[in-house]
Amino acid sequence: MNQSQTWSNGTFSSPDGNIGDTNDNPKVFDANLSNFTGCDSAAILRYEPPSSFTVSSKLEILGRETLDGTLASNRSQTFRIFTTSSSVAAYTVTNSQGEDFDAAPSNWSNGAITAMEIEGNTLNTTLVGFRVDGELLTDPGTLDTTAKDIDSLIDTPTNYTADSGNNGGNYCTLNPLESALTGINDGNLNSGSSGSAGWKICTSTMAVSSGKYYWEGFTDTTASPSQGWQWGFCNVTPSSLTNPYGTGKWSYQHNVVYSQSSSGSNVSVTAGANDLLAYALDMDAGTCKLYVNNSLVHTFTGISGTVTPFVGSYNSPTVTVNFGQRPFAYTPPTGHVSLCTQNLANPTIANGSTAFDIKTYTGNGSSYGNSQTISGLSFNPDFLWIKCRSNSSDHHLADTVNGINKNLESNSTIGNQTNNNNGYISATTSDGFTVVYGGLDGLQTNDNSKTYVAWAWDAGASTASNTDGSITTNVRASQTNGFSIATYTGNGSANQTLGHGLGASPSFVLIKDRSSSQNWAVLHTSAGTLGTLDGGTNYKLLELNANAAARDASYNTIWHPTNTTVKIGEGASSAHWTNKSGDNYVMYAWTPVEGYSAFGSYEGDNSTDGPFVYTGFRPRWVLIKNIDSSSQEWVILDAERNTFNVTGKVLYANTAGAEADLGAINDRHIDILSNGFKVNRGDPLNQSATHVFACFASHPFKTARAR
């Protein structure tokens, strides 16, 4: 009801002759009475809903008398209720010693209500409101006292669709974890000021790549050009939190719009203090409409990627945002919905454990052949990565295409090992795998009383030959899960291609020579580009088994990922990492799946309060590497070994070391959140450098719940 009813501009008078001043122009009914002003003396405010309505149980009258902002006593207010039977019921309510009004008349005439009037009987300001069957009547169309002041908000971890149009779920808010503004308040819906003569911005907790969304914002009483504010949206990882302009940012200030540039364009409408701004974003069309006080001002075009709302302040102005948790002031354009988890697109993978899962277990082997079956996975695993937590031991990587009883080690250059003397995997099951004590010991997989973690991926149901590239590959791929395993034999030639079967360009690729001792070649598309090579983008090379920084153009080993292939095999000795003639190789390739996997980068700041990294889901497994340093490890963290924050129990992919708890060492850790992760202090996670990451979800943000 409260989103569709509006006030009329009908009967309104005031004995002081200043019709429309602050005291004479109350246009909101609200329960938070301390925020509102009302009628002076005989001023009358009339409310007419778009259509008549009936009251099934109770009509409540709310009010408060004030005098210059302080409570007055023994003041009265007259309320009139008009019905379809043409009858009028009038009620006069008097408070006592400045108390709030709270009356529930039950003797109005039969018939549906067509109008309500409020008349002030004293020369004192009155704060007033009606509540019908427990629902507050609100004027969503006025700006001086508006929905921004409503403190009863719709926000719940339970997603549901409501007949009223105000769906249930977690609503977007400003994100204090990705903000240069330090005074965010009002439930993270008010930006707070920058506190200095310089731009500072704050992003939001939700980002979208598809769909149609609407949100509003109110400028404050000091929102002037010299005391600046910014209102806009930007790419999910903004280049700067102290600059509201530039690539990947679209915004509005005063009477200028900015589209990915610091040079703006003037528009016909000037927004100042106490104005209502709104955006109607259509990611499917790549457009966004900007409204000021419900008038269309500008349409942004050419929007792509994943974007999130942001606000900015230069010195003192603030903006109060409303993503739908409060009633909107205006009706959103057709098809546009609030930024609420219920309204987000349904994820391809609703539960991350159906594509990636983690098991921890304790070994039980003490002699050769002792085995145990680990169960409880949500699928039959195709790729298993096992590490002993309690002791120093090599990593154990095995897959069903290479052969599950054969393994590689992420921390070494060694090739295939069959039935490893330090333990191996003998088989997989519909929900797990069997680990065996080896000829020497079981330290890699099943040594008595040792603790282990196993990370498991699902690569689909079948393996087939793939001839998309110049070298034939044997591929097992799940396009739904964005993961494939491929084996091939090198031919020693330059500029070769490998089919990966993903149907989308991979962002993260591991290649290892199975026949001889060679480094692990790693392609990560956020590690930095080196121009073009043989018609494709060349990326810096990384090594999984080493703590080296990213390699330069002399290591042209793996590059140019496309929807069907990647290129390999050009360069000096590094060519042997991916294409030595006659050697057998395995390739693991991932492409991002929205709500399930993410591969990106962040810039560390070497502070105790590091960057927030948006993933669009609650991470379950995170791999991080500082690519600028030659002495920083590949860090693995997960939510199975760390069941609550802080998340600081680490294993290093490039070393054999036992698990270490960095959370207990100078507070070096991350916090796992419902929409990403927050990096904290120091090395190896937050140096002043570029860090790349690979991340897999427990649940997408739509269902991850606020944490």
Residue ranges of each PLM-predicted region?
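Extracellular low-complexity Ser/Thr/Asn/Gly-rich intrinsically disordered segments
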Residues: 1-2, 6, 11-13, 55, ...
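Disordered, acidic Ser/Thr/Pro-rich linker "stalks" and the adjacent N-terminal cap
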Residues: 1-50, 67-73, 95-96, 174-179, ...
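Hydrophobic beta-strand residues in large extracellular and virion-surface proteins
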Residues: 7-12, 45-49, 59-61, 79-81, ...
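Generic beta-strand hydrophobic packing signal
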Residues: 10, 15, 57-62, 116, ...
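Aromatic, loop-rich ligand-recognition surfaces of beta-strand-rich domains
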Residues: 23-89, 102-138
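Residue-level detector of beta-propeller blades
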Residues: 87-89, 96, 296
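Beta-sandwich interaction modules
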Residues: 94-115, 120-122, 369-376, 609-613
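Surface-exposed molecular-recognition determinants
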Residues: 138-212, 218-224, 236-707
